[in-house]
């Protein structure tokens, strides 16, 4: 009997905690349909971005409540998208707006503050590291006022990435937006780990969007030492999370980066991957009825993509910067990929990884011929740029004639430039390769480049 009373009292305590936070008037709708990922709800009128609670089995217990976001409306129906993957919903389930501090809880406001440093959170700012939740008083809007392009600080300072081939041949500027293009299995995660450890930045923000959940912990354990983690923030929305969580995770990471940029910090933002972000938006757009126009992608996906990328970069004059590395997944047999082409057109440069290099044990597997940094001519001296171009020419010349050389069809002395390329290529390949735990700062990389030709 005592055990039964104890259980009843525990239930009453749960109900009491819920009732304390309930407003005097509750607006309520009901679930009348599910179309793909989208829930159709009648009886409510709420702004886009509002979080609603869908009650399973008409229960008010936390365990039976599911959160969903208002993403649009159709005539008198609200369109909601679930924040988690749930399959046991029933018709006529009760739907109510979530209340926080006396007002509707809007997903477009999440915690952004210094307390996030050293933390690992999901796409909604909820802790994944078993530490305390960030107080809602730090919530700010995820949207931000765009900076007048005439007021932005130009990219004029070199960013030391600690990677010899990038420092020497694809020099990155502080505030630059770079794409890392690669298919699976080419050492992309290893290269990102090296950038995270060695890049000279005040704050590091890692946005892991739509990737394998197993890799999230492995990446954090192998890359984020205590020193690096203390100045880092990790936002994780793995592939098993909802598409809404994945899109929010990317936007949330960018908003945090903007916050620190506005405080005059130099921020390194690594987003892995931009392709998963676009795919998540595609699922949402198709679910609410948008028509696909390019390889299954609706037009709104590209506007979202450009909007996200353009938020990175330098801030106003004499303020901080966001140097962003966006990974883009490519299909080697696909001649045209709309996401890759769109990203390439708007980014300030691209680093392409080569399967041929990776399979031969050449790491990092950067294809120097096809990679480019568009700001490099503006931030390095003329001799450095000249040596980098000369390096690329020699590699390109050797690659074009490699088959002739390998089969013995080329006769030495026929082409002096090719003779020089054959002599230098072992040194050039050694310059391009670098161990995972090896760091090469900008000055050392520059000296190594010069020494190849002197």
Swiss-Prot record:
- Catalytic activity from the UniProt record: ATP + H2O + 4 H(+)(in) = ADP + phosphate + 5 H(+)(out)
For this protein, the record's Pfam families field holds: ATP-synt_ab, T3SS_ATPase_C
A single GO molecular function term of this UniProt record: proton-transporting ATP synthase activity, rotational mechanism
Q: What is its EC number?
A: 7.1.2.2
Q: Name one GO biological process term.
A: bacterial-type flagellum organization
Could you tell me which InterPro entries the record lists for this protein?
Answer: AAA+_ATPase (IPR003593), ATPase_a/bsu_AS (IPR020003), ATPase_alpha/beta_chains (IPR050053), ATPase_F1/V1/A1_a/bsu_nucl-bd (IPR000194), ATPase_T3SS_FliI/YscN (IPR005714), P-loop_NTPase (IPR027417), T3SS_ATPase_C (IPR040627)
A GO-annotated cellular component:
type III protein secretion system complex
Instruction: Give the UniProt subcellular location, in the record's own words.
Output: Cytoplasm
Sites where the protein binds ATP: 182-189
Organism superkingdom: Bacteria
Q: Where are the coiled-coil regions? A: none
Family indicated by similarity: Belongs to the ATPase alpha/beta chains family.
Biological role stated in the UniProt entry: Probable catalytic subunit of a protein translocase for flagellum-specific export, or a proton translocase involved in local circuits at the flagellum. May be involved in a specialized protein export pathway that proceeds without signal peptide cleavage.
In its UniProt entry, what is this protein called?
Flagellum-specific ATP synthase
Give the species: Buchnera aphidicola subsp. Baizongia pistaciae (strain Bp)
Q: What is the lineage of its organism?
A: Bacteria, Pseudomonadati, Pseudomonadota, Gammaproteobacteria, Enterobacterales
* Gene name per UniProt: fliI
């Amino acid at each position: 009997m005592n055990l039964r009373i104890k259980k009843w009292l525990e239930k009453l305590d749960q109900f009491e905690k819920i009732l304390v936070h309930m407003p005097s008037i509750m607006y309520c709708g009901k679930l009348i349909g599910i179309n793909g990922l989208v829930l159709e709800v009648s009886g409510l009128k709420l702004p886009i971005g509002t979080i609603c609670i869908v009650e399973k089995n008409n229960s008010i217990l936390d365990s039976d409540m599911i959160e969903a976001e208002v993403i649009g409306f159709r005539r008198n129906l609200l369109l909601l998208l679930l924040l988690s993957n749930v399959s046991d919903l029933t018709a006529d389930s009760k739907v109510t707006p979530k209340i926080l501090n006396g007002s509707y809880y809007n997903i477009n406001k999440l915690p952004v503050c210094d307390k996030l440093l050293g933390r690992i959170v999901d796409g909604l700012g909820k802790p994944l590291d078993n530490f305390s939740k960030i107080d809602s008083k730090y919530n700010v809007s995820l949207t931000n006022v765009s900076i007048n392009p005439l007021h932005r600080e130009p990219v004029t300072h070199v960013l030391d990435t600690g990677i010899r081939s990038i420092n020497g041949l694809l020099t990155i500027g502080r505030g630059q937006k770079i794409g890392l293009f690669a298919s699976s299995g080419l050492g992309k995660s290893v290269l990102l780990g090296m950038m995270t450890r060695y890049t000279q930045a005040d704050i590091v923000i890692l946005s892991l969007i739509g990737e394998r959940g197993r890799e999230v912990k492995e990446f954090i354990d192998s890359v984020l030492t205590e020193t690096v983690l203390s100045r880092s923030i990790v936002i994780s929305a793995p592939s098993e999370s909802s598409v809404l969580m994945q899109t929010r995770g990317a936007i949330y990471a960018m908003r945090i980066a903007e916050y620190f940029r506005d405080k005059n910090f130099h921020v390194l933002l690594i987003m892995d991957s931009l392709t998963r972000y676009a795919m998540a938006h595609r699922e949402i757009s198709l679910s609410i009825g948008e028509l696909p126009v390019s390889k299954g992608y609706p037009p709104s996906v590209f506007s979202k993509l450009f909007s996200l990328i353009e938020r990175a970069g330098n801030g106003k004059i004499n303020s901080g910067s966001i140097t962003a590395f966006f990974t883009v997944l490519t299909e080697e047999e696909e001649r045209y990929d709309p996401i890759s082409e769109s990203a390439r057109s708007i980014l300030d440069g691209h680093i392409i990884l080569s399967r041929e290099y990776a399979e031969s044990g050449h790491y990092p597997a950067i294809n120097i011929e096809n990679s480019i940094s568009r700001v490099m001519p503006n931030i390095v001296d003329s001799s450095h740029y000249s040596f980098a171009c000369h390096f690329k020419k020699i590699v390109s010349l050797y690659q074009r004639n490699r088959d002739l050389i390998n089969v013995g069809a080329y006769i030495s002395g026929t082409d002096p430039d090719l003779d020089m390329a054959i002599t230098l290529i072992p040194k050039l390949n050694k310059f391009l390769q670098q161990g995972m735990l090896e760091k090469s700062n900008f000055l050392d990389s520059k000296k190594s480049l010069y020494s190849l030709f002197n």
